[in-house]
Amino acid sequence: MPKIKTNRGAAKRFRKSASGRVKRGNAFTSHILTHKTRKNKRNLRGTSMVSDVDQKNISRLIPYK
């Protein structure tokens, strides 16, 4: 049986944590930041976890990460 291809777009956007859950970056951080509050921008730093509903689908896209 052939190897499963990794979806390259997903590989750049998601990482797996040590426990196997999928981490993601936050949206709304690349441009048009002047009208966003300091608090809002601060809370968008770092990573978040992908919702439980989407975990299975994204894990299939990045099988070897």
From Swiss-Prot:
Pfam families hit by this protein: Ribosomal_L35p
KW Ribonucleoprotein (keyword) present: yes
One term under GO cellular component: cytosolic large ribosomal subunit
InterPro entries, sorted: Ribosomal_bL35, Ribosomal_bL35-like, Ribosomal_bL35_CS, Ribosomal_bL35_sf
Basic residues compositional bias, start-end: 10-24, 33-44
PROSITE patterns: RIBOSOMAL_L35
Family indicated by similarity: Belongs to the bacterial ribosomal protein bL35 family.
Matches recorded under NCBIfam families: rpmI_bact
Protein name (database record): Large ribosomal subunit protein bL35
Organism this protein belongs to: Pelobacter propionicus (strain DSM 2379 / NBRC 103807 / OttBd1)
Organism taxonomic ancestry: Bacteria, Pseudomonadati, Thermodesulfobacteriota, Desulfuromonadia, Desulfuromonadales
The encoding gene: rpmI
